[in-house]
């Protein structure tokens, strides 16, 4: 499906965004290996999270979905062997986190996914899980499809070469099956939803700076999980309301976990008018309402420990940078190359088609703030984050912008276009 977007004169309104993708995935997985019932409210009905539900069902877990409410009947740590190959669709979170759970089972499981998943690096998970005693056979180059042979696992000390919440979470899930404690050291803190959820479900986790230690032998008990709105989905409205003239948008009940709020910090540093109200804590997660007003932005440099806190938002930050005064430099973001698309390359090439002065670098991009884009036909590369970022670009471009394969937003935000139409 192709979709057309035209320049907007203003954006005004109060909206909610769907449940957080990271928390939705983890609630289903951890609920599945806990004992008793886990009830999840405001679950994200995106394709990726549905892939997680389907995989857990194939492993013998009883899961009931009614609207955005999910009821998981936990089986405890040990699941049933799947009769079929598990298909994770487009979901990197599903395949990487599931590998951690499957490493400690008493059977083997084969995992596959779509073409994008088959191009994404799995070695970063295979290496630490193998050190723990897991046996994993993958396609040459450590790509999916891959087979995980469940085994007795041992605790390890693992120093991660890059900050990745998916890799960290996979090791943490495997650590539940180990004979001794496991310590993970990150170069920078990545999103910590797994640590927070482990604690609320009864696992023993100690966090000391960038070191996370998990202890086996603690029973996980089913919980009630209320999933806050996803800040990665809110990011498109934050940037759009900052750029489009005469705008004021409030986004209700958004997850403002400090490991995820890089987008707010960056837009504020660029000159954005963003106010958080009604701040509270739900299931160990910080939640707030976010109000954004039109602002004039200036270019800045973004890199280092900030990158893991906004890795998924960099494409839409690039759009904001086009309308900032001066130059914006984004560095230390090589991780973007191994997302659903090579996001450094894809956002650069598509914004160039719209007239942006944007240049790809080895680990990021440089954007000259020209304050101008013209409508064109652009490609989403079947990457939901690219499609949504280009939609925001289209709201500011002269003329009409056509986004090809725009339905890929269903991965994380099926009602994305509809929500914008409400403003």
From Swiss-Prot:
<dbReference type="GO" id="GO:0008652">
    <property type="term" value="P:amino acid biosynthetic process"/>
</dbReference>
<keyword id="KW-0963">Cytoplasm</keyword>
<dbReference type="InterPro" id="IPR013792">
    <property type="entry name" value="RNA3'P_cycl/enolpyr_Trfase_a/b"/>
</dbReference>
<dbReference type="GO" id="GO:0005737">
    <property type="term" value="C:cytoplasm"/>
</dbReference>
<feature type="binding site">
    <location>
        <position position="21"/>
    </location>
    <ligand>
        <name>3-phosphoshikimate</name>
    </ligand>
</feature>
<dbReference type="GO" id="GO:0009423">
    <property type="term" value="P:chorismate biosynthetic process"/>
</dbReference>
<feature type="binding site">
    <location>
        <position position="21"/>
    </location>
    <ligand>
        <name>phosphoenolpyruvate</name>
    </ligand>
</feature>
<feature type="binding site">
    <location>
        <position position="343"/>
    </location>
    <ligand>
        <name>phosphoenolpyruvate</name>
    </ligand>
</feature>
<feature type="binding site">
    <location>
        <position position="22"/>
    </location>
    <ligand>
        <name>3-phosphoshikimate</name>
    </ligand>
</feature>
<feature type="binding site">
    <location>
        <position position="120"/>
    </location>
    <ligand>
        <name>phosphoenolpyruvate</name>
    </ligand>
</feature>
<feature type="active site" description="Proton acceptor">
    <location>
        <position position="312"/>
    </location>
</feature>
<dbReference type="Pfam" id="PF00275">
    <property type="entry name" value="EPSP_synthase"/>
</dbReference>
<feature type="binding site">
    <location>
        <position position="164"/>
    </location>
    <ligand>
        <name>3-phosphoshikimate</name>
    </ligand>
</feature>
<dbReference type="InterPro" id="IPR036968">
    <property type="entry name" value="Enolpyruvate_Tfrase_sf"/>
</dbReference>
<dbReference type="GO" id="GO:0003866">
    <property type="term" value="F:3-phosphoshikimate 1-carboxyvinyltransferase activity"/>
</dbReference>
<comment type="similarity">
    <text>Belongs to the EPSP synthase family.</text>
</comment>
<feature type="binding site">
    <location>
        <position position="166"/>
    </location>
    <ligand>
        <name>3-phosphoshikimate</name>
    </ligand>
</feature>
<dbReference type="InterPro" id="IPR006264">
    <property type="entry name" value="EPSP_synthase"/>
</dbReference>
<comment type="subunit">
    <text>Monomer.</text>
</comment>
<feature type="binding site">
    <location>
        <position position="166"/>
    </location>
    <ligand>
        <name>phosphoenolpyruvate</name>
    </ligand>
</feature>
<keyword id="KW-0057">Aromatic amino acid biosynthesis</keyword>
<comment type="function">
    <text>Catalyzes the transfer of the enolpyruvyl moiety of phosphoenolpyruvate (PEP) to the 5-hydroxyl of shikimate-3-phosphate (S3P) to produce enolpyruvyl shikimate-3-phosphate and inorganic phosphate.</text>
</comment>
<feature type="binding site">
    <location>
        <position position="312"/>
    </location>
    <ligand>
        <name>3-phosphoshikimate</name>
    </ligand>
</feature>
<feature type="binding site">
    <location>
        <position position="385"/>
    </location>
    <ligand>
        <name>phosphoenolpyruvate</name>
    </ligand>
</feature>
<feature type="binding site">
    <location>
        <position position="26"/>
    </location>
    <ligand>
        <name>3-phosphoshikimate</name>
    </ligand>
</feature>
<dbReference type="InterPro" id="IPR001986">
    <property type="entry name" value="Enolpyruvate_Tfrase_dom"/>
</dbReference>
<keyword id="KW-0028">Amino-acid biosynthesis</keyword>
<feature type="binding site">
    <location>
        <position position="339"/>
    </location>
    <ligand>
        <name>3-phosphoshikimate</name>
    </ligand>
</feature>
<dbReference type="GO" id="GO:0009073">
    <property type="term" value="P:aromatic amino acid family biosynthetic process"/>
</dbReference>
<comment type="pathway">
    <text>Metabolic intermediate biosynthesis; chorismate biosynthesis; chorismate from D-erythrose 4-phosphate and phosphoenolpyruvate: step 6/7.</text>
</comment>
<protein>
    <recommendedName>
        <fullName>3-phosphoshikimate 1-carboxyvinyltransferase</fullName>
        <ecNumber>2.5.1.19</ecNumber>
    </recommendedName>
</protein>
<feature type="binding site">
    <location>
        <position position="92"/>
    </location>
    <ligand>
        <name>phosphoenolpyruvate</name>
    </ligand>
</feature>
<keyword id="KW-0808">Transferase</keyword>
<dbReference type="InterPro" id="IPR023193">
    <property type="entry name" value="EPSP_synthase_CS"/>
</dbReference>
